[in-house]
UniProtKB/Swiss-Prot annotation:
CDD domains: RNAP_beta'_C (cd02655), RNAP_beta'_N (cd01609). It comes from the Bacteria. DNA-dependent RNA polymerase catalyzes the transcription of DNA into RNA using the four ribonucleoside triphosphates as substrates. Zn(2+) 2 binds at C814, C888, C895, C898. NCBIfam families: rpoC_TIGR. Its cofactor is Mg(2+); Zn(2+). The RNAP catalytic core consists of 2 alpha, 1 beta, 1 beta' and 1 omega subunit. When a sigma factor is associated with the core the holoenzyme is formed, which can initiate transcription. It catalyses: RNA(n) + a ribonucleoside 5'-triphosphate = RNA(n+1) + diphosphate. GO terms for molecular function: DNA binding; DNA-directed RNA polymerase activity; magnesium ion binding; zinc ion binding. This is DNA-directed RNA polymerase subunit beta'. Its EC number is 2.7.7.6. It comes from Baumannia cicadellinicola subsp. Homalodisca coagulata. Mg(2+) binds at D460, D462, D464. Belongs to the RNA polymerase beta' chain family.
Length: 1408
């Protein structure tokens, strides 16, 4: 038995935990935490500063004020540890127990916990099924509630006013029982039979037809069940005992001058205790009811204020009108416990200083000021001094360091050798905001930073500051070196391109070095190699730009890392030959033999990394930087005012424009054009003029004519300094040069509209006062925008991180066969993103076959690297199905194959990689570069004329997709389908262009025809929508009665008459129910059927349609029967930039969204109501029909009798992602969100890999709603984690029971974060009170799966290097459980054996 007891004791002590559970505390539990009751509101004696007995700081309850010393001083020192002083009753122990010992207050009357009352939806209200208003009236003593109805007609939970109560008392006497206040509610909650109530509701819900009622019942069932399962009792939501926080967590600090600084909680507790004591006294005196009631109400209010001040009634303020901070305020918000102390902690061993350039550093180094290093590495120095025997004690070592003796510096050098430090620049928007470097000691007080890492930090040297952190433990140093060293972060995790890219001076230096100049000194020489080139350059025999022939030795890398040498004489320049000396072996000479701008340098580094790997790339990057700086200095580039050459034609262009404007002004005054047209035309004219000036200026700047060595004129690229800076990509853009030397052009007002008088001057000429004033308009808006943008972008990043934080790569391969189909992104005539860019680094889902053959080109589950992409391009594969995070089958996290390549490392992603956080950072980090504004269409900034034709840009073959068409009498193709697309593909079948073709477009060529570039192949009238017949025959009017449904109009100019259908609103009452239509009949007046269906060919005409044919006219298929004028959509604002990205990720439903067909079938219209028309879709295969009411002002894309597929657009508008998910499925919504988000980023030139957006989409699709619960105990209409449904379904399938059917839900990122399984993560994000209330009622358990929860409980995160630790812990705990089970079994066996022995022996003793 002893062993068993030992075992139990050992188990109670363990600190290891795998999950955290939150639940309601019962009164007994609160008493068990407590070390005594707080009876008095006093805190400490103001003279002696000793805590008062039984007060809020009482030493007897909470522990001693000084370590191992009782209050009266009878027991001091360690030897009396654990003694309780008989005089003052204080236990002799450490002071720190005052941080953990709690007290309690016995409340004289029960009080409702405000969180469960007022946090919506009110838990108490839902449980009792009473409105919150009524419960509040009971709690705050305004009305009675019946607790026992007895034999009367009064029911339980019925509310009675004072008068009704008195009447009932007269009538029934004491047959019934009604109470008020929290006691009443407590009584009701206590007497609830949860399980019976649950059964009853489950029976009720089956017969309920109304949606709202069912939702309400489902909510109640869920709440009741959560109480049953969690073991919480409903009456615990009413407090009888109030716990008191340990005093050291609500300190009271004496200030000088006899005042005290105190925590607000003390004030709040004091009010509660005062009111409680007063209430006790009143109850003892048996005071009149009304007084007691008032006191109880005051107590309730005091407890409310303590728990959550300001939740109900007015906020309780302190003496200086500041609201008191209650317990709820302590944990919520940015300054609350979660975000301030648990997720963001201050760290020791850190420093910060201004940064300056360290152009001589290596990529893995940073310059650390000596003063700083001495302070930061102090403990290491002390240790080293002691080990070396230079100091005898730590104290001596301290003295030596303070005196800064010479030997200390030597020791410091040794200590910092190969000890990496971490540099961080705020704001840390992505993981490259913290990198590790080896410190190099420098004089001065500024940290020196390597110029190439500035791009990753987004740092510049205009006064930026950076922080230094020291990794202390060996493991930390190891991680810093192996994972965070700047040399390991060459590629950006957002797009897999190099982020260590030279910029500014370096680019200018390399550009200058690789340019060629006609007729420069030394031209035409033939040199033996780069060494000689350098020699003659330094000797001044040849110039840097001289065109020469050089013998170049190239090395080509063959598969098994062998280098093959190849020598040849190449035409190049001296500069390029010199640059070739630093290029590592294995790269081709063409990389250098060109004019190097920023893009080509980036490409060169990328190639180097892919061919040669990490180490040569790092060395190469450093060399590029040194060389670039050296030659930028040599070039002597600087900007002078004469570099800004103003084009000669400028004045003439501006005069022309002014004349045109004057002409339009005249037309406007004589009333030929409207004000709007005049404004638009003026802006068009000026925009065109600006373009012409800019073109003239650039032509002038960019080239110059020079004489070559043969005395002939030759055009060469200019050596103008400003042009060189812009052309190389070092600084400045064409738009900025235009403002310096062209004209500033049109300016926008802060509201986005364009001022019609442009600034014709440029900065070189100088602006006059008016021009300057107009300039400031836009500039100020720019600054205001930037400030707003930063905050918004940061908030978006925070929401993204929160939704994706728990997504980690957890397995190698989930074995799924599904994936998403990737095609190149083509908009109109441009390939915006090639297939290669989209599939690089993804894993194939299925075997890819050679186009047109059955040979396998790429096997399934192949990671597509650069070589595979080359093969795919050779064979011109046009679409590929690749694995995606969205379709990954892993239950928790995702698998490596579905994610593909780790972009920052260039190989398949490792297990434990925190891909969620990386995705969130990659999307959020460029957020500050996006615009904030909403574009107004209007003005030259953004105006597209209504499209009316398609003109192709490339040669190729025409291909129609989803197109239905008829051939008209002129033998042209007329499109009759709604979502036809037209693609132009080259001879290999690769799509080059793609366009949408509207209904009624006339095509010049058919499917499969050859097209030459510049040809117009389709045109249509953008202002009307035609009605096109698909059959031949004669027209017959039906229900077209003049004056009732139609009127005739005659055009004044042409004299042609036409029939116009009246809108239903304009018709007389007799014409309201008539439905005008055109029927197509044959010569015998018999109906003609639409080909392929059994529907007669008749076309119902909506209001405002214009018909130009007469009754009985002969028509042929493809003719236009009628035209419906389309209002061109007014100037709708295009939401762009950051707000658009936020809208997409929040899955917001747009205003006036597109209406999509809910089912496939034939369209017809039912009976209209006042403002809406009834659209009916009848299924082709069954008798089902689907009805929908659509507002009349919505313009429909479909005619009666037309066939639609589920998910087709019926009325145009922005599509709602929820509709896309419901009608077209997960793949479609993924594609939609990816494309829309990418459009915004592409506009700003930011590249982000699709993977990252897919990761966020996966998290948005985490939940599903249950349609049929099958064999599980879930409820219909309940929203459940999708992974949970998958697991339950697998289980049900194996047991042969019915599986759950469900639909996937799309949640916005904020909602998804709050709906996560982990309540700790949700509570630390937003709405802390609501999340915690919900979690505690349900008795939720947090399994600590995500990263955030583990940071909060102070563990290593289950990602990266912590992943292995968590795997190991899981294995260990499983092992331990098994061992414990075994031990318990053996111990029990032993105990029973011993017992048997005992009994036997006692029996034998008796016998004797």
């Amino acid at each position: 038995m002893k062993d068993l007891f030992k075992l139990l004791k050992a188990q109670a002590k363990t600190e290891e935990f795998d999950a955290i559970k939150i639940a309601l505390a019962s009164p007994d539990m609160i008493r068990s935490w407590s070390f005594g009751e707080v009876k008095k509101p006093e805190t400490i004696n103001y003279r002696t500063f000793k805590p008062e007995r039984d007060g809020l700081f009482c030493a007897r309850i909470f522990g001693p004020v000084k370590d191992y010393e009782c209050l009266c001083g009878k027991y001091k020192r360690l030897k009396h540890r654990g003694v309780i002083c008989e005089k003052c009753g204080v236990e002799v122990t450490q002071t720190k127990v005052r941080r953990e010992r709690m007290g309690h207050i016995e409340l004289a009357s029960p009080t409702a916990h405000i969180w469960f009352l007022k946090s919506l939806p009110s838990r108490i209200g839902l449980l009792l099924d009473m409105p919150l208003r009524d419960i509040e009236r009971v709690l705050y003593f305004e009305s009675y509630v019946v607790v026992e109805g007895g034999m009367t007609y009064l029911e339980r939970n019925q509310i009675l006013t004072e008068e009704q109560y008195l009447d009932a008392l007269e009538e029934f006497g004491d047959e019934f029982d009604a109470k008020m206040g929290a006691e009443a509610i407590h009584h009701l909650l206590k007497n609830m039979d949860l399980e019976q109530e649950c059964e009853q509701l489950r029976e009720e819900i089956v017969d309920v037809s109304s949606e709202t009622k069912r939702k309400k019942l489902t909510k109640r069932i869920k709440l009741l069940e959560s109480f049953v399962h969690s073991g919480n009792k409903p009456e615990w939501m009413i407090l009888n005992v109030l716990p008191v926080l340990p005093p050291d967590l609500r300190p009271l600090v004496p200030l000088d001058g006899g005042r005290f600084a105190t925590s607000d909680l003390n004030d709040l507790y004091r009010r509660v205790i005062n009111r409680n004591n007063r209430l006790k006294r009143l109850l003892d005196l048996s005071a009149p009811d009304i007084i007691v009631r008032n006191e109880k109400r005051m107590l309730q209010e005091a407890v409310d204020a303590l728990l959550d001040n300001g939740r109900r009634g007015r906020v309780i303020t302190s003496s200086n009108k500041r609201p008191l901070k209650s317990l709820a305020d302590m944990i919520k918000g940015k300054q609350g416990r979660f975000r301030q102390n648990l997720l963001g902690k201050r760290v020791d061993y850190s420093g910060r200083s201004v940064i300056t350039v360290g152009p001589y550093l290596r990529l893995h180094q940073c310059g650390l000021p000596k003063k700083m290093a001495l302070e930061l590495f102090k403990p290491f120095i002390y240790g080293k001094l002691e080990i070396c025997g230079l100091a005898t004690t730590i104290k001596a070592a301290k003295k030596m360091v303070e005196r800064e003796e010479a030997v200390v510096w030597d020791v410091l050098d040794e200590v910092i050798r190969e000890h990496p430090v971490m540099l961080n620049r705020a704001p840390t928007l992505h993981r490259l905001g913290i990198q590790a470097f080896e410190p190099v000691l420098v004089e001065g007080k500024a940290i020196q930073l390597h110029p190439l890492v500035c791009a990753a930090y987004n740092a510049d040297f205009d006064g930026d500051q950076m922080a230094v952190h020291i990794p202390l433990t060996l493991e930390a140093q190891l991680e810093a070196r192996a994972l965070m060293m700047s040399t390991n972060n060459i590629l950006s995790p957002a797009n897999g391109e190099p982020i260590i890219v030279p910029s500014q001076d370096v680019v200018l230096g390399l550009y200058y070095m690789t340019r060629d100049r006609v007729n420069s000194k030394g031209e035409g020489m033939i040199l033996t190699g780069p060494k000689e080139a350098e020699k003659i350059y330094h000797a001044g025999i040849a110039e840097l730009h001289a065109r020469v022939k050089v013998r170049i030795t190239e090395y080509e890398k063959i598969d098994d890392n062998e280098l093959v040498e190849k020598k040849q004489i190449i035409d190049t320049t001296i500069g390029r030959a010199i640059l070739w000396m630093i290029v590592p072996k294995g790269l081709p000479f063409d990389l250098v033999n060109q004019v190097l701008g920023k893009k080509s340098i980036s490409k060169m580094l990328n190639t180097c990394y892919r061919i040669l790997g990490l180490k040569p790339t790092v060395i190469f990057a450093d060399q590029i930087m040194y060389t670039g700086f050296a030659y930028a200095a040599r070039s002597g580039s600087s900007v002078g005012i004469d570099d800004m050459v103003i084009p000669a034609h400028k004045a003439e262009i501006i005069d022309d424009a002014e004349n045109e404007v004057a002409e339009i002004q005249e037309q406007f005054q004589s009333g030929l054009v409207t004000a709007g047209e005049r404004y638009n035309k003026v802006i068009d004219i000026w925009a065109a003029a600006n373009e012409r000036v800019a073109k003239a200026m650039m032509d002038n700047l960019s080239t110059e004519v020079v004489l070559n060595c043969h005395g002939k004129e030759e055009l060469q690229v200019s050596f103008n300094n400003i042009f060189m800076m812009s052309d190389s990509g070092a600084r400045g853009s064409a738009a900025q040069i235009r403002q310096l030397a062209g004209m500033r052009g049109l300016m926008a007002k802060p509201d986005g509209s364009i001022i019609e008088t442009p600034i014709t001057a440029n900065f070189r000429e100088g602006l006059n006062v008016l021009q300057y004033f107009i300039s400031t308009h836009g500039a100020r808006k720019g600054l205001a925008d930037t400030a707003l943008k930063t905050a918004n972008s940061g908030y978006l990043t925070r929401r993204l991180v929160d939704v994706a934080q728990d997504l980690v790569v957890t397995e190698e391969d989930c074995g799924t066969l599904s994936g998403i189909v990737m095609t190149p992104v083509i908009e109109g005539g441009d390939v915006k993103e090639s297939l290669r860019e989209r599939v690089l680094g993804r894993v194939t889902t299925e075997n890819i076959l050679q186009p047109g053959k059955t040979d396998i080109l790429v096997k399934r589950n192949t990671l597509l690297n650069e070589q595979w992409c080359d093969i795919l391009e050779e064979h011109s594969v046009d679409n590929i199905k690749v694995r995606s995070v969205v379709t990954c089958d892993a239950d928790f996290g995702v698998c490596a194959y579905c994610y593909g390549r780790d972009l920052a490392r260039g190989h398949l992603v490792n297990k434990g990689e925190a891909i969620g956080v990386i995705a969130a950072q990659s999307i959020g980090e460029p957020g500050t570069q996006l615009t904030m504004r909403t574009f107004h269409i209007g003005g030259a900034a953004f105006r597209a004329a209504a499209e009316s034709s398609i003109q192709v840009k490339n040669h190729g073959i025409l291909c129609l997709v989803n197109a239905k068409f008829v051939i008209n009498s002129a033998n042209k193709i007329v499109i009759t389908s709604r979502n036809a697309e037209l693609k132009i593909s080259d001879e290999f079948g690769r799509t080059k262009e793609s366009y949408k073709v509207p209904y009624g477009a006339i095509m010049a060529k058919g499917d499969g025809a050859n097209i030459i570039s510049g040809e117009t192949i389709a045109n249509w009238d953008p202002h009307t929508m035609p009605v096109i017949t698909e059959v031949n025959g004669f027209i017959r009017f039906t229900d077209m009665i003049e004056g009732q449904t139609i009127i005739r109009q005659t055009d004044e100019l042409t004299g042609l008459s036409s029939i116009v259908i009246l809108d239903t609103a304009e018709r007389t009452s007799s014409g309201k129910d008539l439905r005008p239509a055109l029927k197509i009949v044959d010569a015998n007046q018999q109906d003609i059927l639409i080909p392929g269906t059994d529907m007669p060919a008749q076309y119902f005409l909506p209001g405002k349609t214009i018909v130009q044919l007469e009754d009985g006219t002969k028509i042929t298929s493809g003719d236009t029967l009628a035209r419906l004028p389309q209002e061109t959509s007014g100037t709708k604002d295009i939401t762009g930039g950051l707000p658009r990205v936020a809208d997409l990720f929040e899955a917001r439903i747009p205003k006036e969204p597109a209406i999509l067909a809910e089912a496939s079938g034939i369209i017809s219209f039912g009976k209209d109501t006042k403002g809406k028309r009834r659209l009916v879709i009848s299924s082709l295969h069954s008798n089902d029909s689907y009805e929908e009411m659509i507002p009349k002002w919505r313009q429909l894309n479909v005619f009666e009798g037309e066939r639609v597929e589920r998910g087709d657009v019926i009325s145009d508008g922005p599509e709602s992602p929820h509709d896309i998910l419901r009608l077209r499925g997960v793949h479609a919504v993924t594609r939609y969100i990816i494309n829309e988000v990418q459009d915004v980023y592409r506009l700003q030139g930011v590249r982000i890999n699709d993977k990252h957006i897919e990761v966020i989409v996966r998290q948005m699709l985490r939940k599903a709603t249950i349609i049929n619960a099958g064999g599980s105990d879930l409820l219909e209409g309940e929203q459940v984690e999708y992974s949970r449904i998958k697991i339950i379904n697998r289980q049900l399938k194996s047991e042969g029971r019915q599986e759950i059917t469900y639909v996937r839900d799309l949640l916005g990122i904020t909602k998804a974060s709050l709906a996560t399984e982990s309540f700790i993560s949700a509570a630390s994000f937003q709405e802390t009170t609501r999340v915690l209330t919900e979690a505690s009622v349900a008795g939720k358990r947090d399994d600590l799966r995500g990263l955030k929860e583990n940071v909060i409980v102070g563990r290593l995160i289950p990602a990266g290097t912590g992943y292995a630790y968590h795997q190991e812990r899981a294995r260990y705990s499983k092992h331990r459980e098994e061992a414990l089970d075994m031990q318990q079994i053996t111990a029990a066996d032993e105990a029973s054996a011993n017992l048997a022995e005992l009994l036997n022996s006692s029996l034998t003793n008796h016998k004797h």
